[in-house]
């Protein structure tokens, strides 16, 4: 049985562990420190993650301790970001070996994930803006560590430029909030009494600034360029970027959620996020580069997460960003497994495949209808039901319909059932854990729900048409447009890394 500790004690232990990990990272930067010290550093870096887990398990409810807001969401996000960072650092021990910036990567990984976790523990908006700014700076430094490569320099410039705009937008929103409420504490700013003081234009203006601050790190249209060009960063950097940092918008919007209720800013966020979902999906479908496929996937997934926020489903958005982070980190760290020998897929009995396809459609429709009746019947649940039914049908098609022979279909069915059970178990556990009054879903307006459903149906119709008419003019136009949107600028692309010539001429990396 775990020893029950007070919130202030856990907070003190957390900052001691975090300071120790930062000190370890600084020590590793010293040239005289042997490279094998990295293993000790990984052990020390695990301490704040363990303390945040202990705090999460011992959480005694919503507590405000000085400038810190210690609720379940805060400790969960601290644990999530630090654990993702720890796993990626462990992966990088051998992956980045030989890189001239080897030591700097670990120091920056530790610093960036550390200040990011502190940002979500902050109740004081001044601490939050400082920590979030430090997180963005750390991310830019990670992207630009390979200074000898011109392409990386270009990616660093555009990332730094857009992140500066994002940070200034959030800073402006926070200062505006202080001028109206006279409060720096977030929990005091978003009370019903203070929110009622806001005029319509003031509320919309603040919300639009927060939306801009959120959309840029989430790589939403028209700010997706930085994420596309950052694909030149090493795989561990991309992993921490996609899994633990770009999804911060969901947490930020959740913290400021009372401000967005019944405001036109929700519709604006919904429109831009829906466009981003379409663009990201198109990029992931047409790109042949594995990392750019994942970039497109992240743009689409972050768009859907922001759609959830726009519909008032903040709890669903938080669960989405956690599951997406775990999934995307796994995909990046397992990127090498995508290089497989080409196999000729044998066509099975066409009639049998069509029969299994029909079964999948009926099953997906049945699950969607059942989910709709079982849930509370809120507007967002209808969207969830449609997505759940489509996801089940798509998974059935890939794992069962395209399975080779009877054993292949049986294996696919077992995998589908197993992962479905795991997903629902994790989803329900997180839902019960995070289900507090502050993060209750707000009933979305009927036009917003109808708009999202129309976007989903439109996307489905377009995909079906393109699949069945690949030689049509519309298919060619959509393909070329998706390729163009998903490509980096010409000066941000090289057919071969030019900096390698310098390394080869010196006999390798030193």
UniProtKB/Swiss-Prot annotation:
One of its GO terms (cellular component) is plasma membrane. It is found in: Cell membrane. Keywords: Cell membrane, Membrane, Transmembrane, Transmembrane helix, Transport. It comes from the Bacteria. Belongs to the inorganic carbon transporter (TC 9.A.2) DabB family. Forms a complex with DabA. This is Probable inorganic carbon transporter subunit DabB. It comes from Bacillus anthracis.
């Amino acid at each position: 049985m775990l020893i029950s500790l007070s919130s202030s004690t856990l907070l003190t232990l957390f900052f001691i562990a975090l300071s120790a990990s930062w000190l370890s990272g600084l020590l590793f930067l010293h040239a005289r420190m042997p490279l094998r010290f990295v293993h000790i550093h990984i052990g020390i870096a695990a301490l704040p993650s363990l303390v945040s887990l202990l705090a999460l398990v011992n959480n005694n409810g919503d507590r405000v301790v000085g400038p810190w807001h210690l609720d379940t969401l805060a400790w969960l996000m601290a644990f999530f970001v630090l654990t993702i960072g720890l796993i990626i650092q462990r992966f990088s021990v051998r992956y980045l070996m030989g890189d001239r910036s080897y030591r700097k990567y670990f120091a920056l990984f530790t610093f960036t994930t550390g200040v990011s976790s502190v940002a979500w523990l902050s109740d004081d908006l001044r601490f939050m803006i400082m920590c979030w700014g430090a997180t963005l700076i750390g991310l830019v430094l990670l992207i630009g560590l390979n200074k000898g490569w011109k392409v990386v320099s270009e990616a660093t410039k555009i990332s730094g430029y857009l992140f500066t705009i994002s940070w200034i937008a959030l800073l402006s929103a926070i200062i505006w909030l202080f001028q109206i409420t006279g409060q720096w504490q977030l929990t005091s700013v978003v009370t019903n009494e203070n929110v009622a003081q806001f005029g319509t234009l003031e509320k919309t203006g603040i919300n639009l600034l927060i939306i801009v601050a959120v959309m840029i790190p989430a790589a939403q249209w028209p700010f997706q360029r930085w994420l596309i060009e950052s694909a030149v960063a090493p795989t561990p950097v991309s992993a921490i970027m996609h899994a633990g940092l770009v999804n911060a918008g969901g947490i930020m919007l959740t913290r400021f959620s009372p401000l967005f209720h019944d405001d036109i800013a929700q519709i604006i966020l919904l429109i831009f996020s829906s466009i981003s979902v379409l663009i990201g999906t198109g990029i992931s479908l047409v790109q042949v580069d594995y990392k750019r496929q994942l970039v497109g996937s992240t743009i689409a997934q972050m768009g859907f997460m922001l759609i959830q926020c726009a519909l008032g489903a903040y709890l669903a958005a938080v669960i989405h960003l956690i599951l997406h982070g775990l999934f995307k980190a796994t995909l990046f760290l397992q990127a090498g497994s995508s290089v497989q020998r080409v196999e000729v897929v044998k066509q099975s009995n066409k009639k049998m495949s069509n029969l299994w396809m029909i079964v999948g459609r009926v099953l997906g429709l049945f699950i969607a209808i059942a989910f709709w009746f079982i849930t509370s019947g809120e507007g967002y649940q209808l969207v969830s039901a449609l997505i759940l039914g489509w996801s089940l049908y798509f998974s059935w098609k890939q794992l069962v319909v395209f399975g080779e022979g009877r054993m292949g279909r049986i294996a696919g069915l077992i995998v589908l059932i197993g992962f479905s059970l795991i997903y629902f178990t994790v989803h329900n556990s997180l839902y019960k854990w995070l289900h507090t009054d502050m993060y209750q879903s707000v009933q979305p307006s009927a036009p917003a729900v109808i708009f999202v459903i129309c976007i989903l149906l439109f996307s489905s119709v377009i995909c079906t048409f393109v699949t069945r008419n690949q030689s049509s003019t519309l298919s060619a136009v959509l393909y070329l447009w998706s390729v163009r949107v998903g490509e980096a600028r010409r000066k941000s692309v090289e057919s071969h890394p030019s900096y390698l010539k310098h390394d080869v001429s010196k006999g390798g990396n030193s």
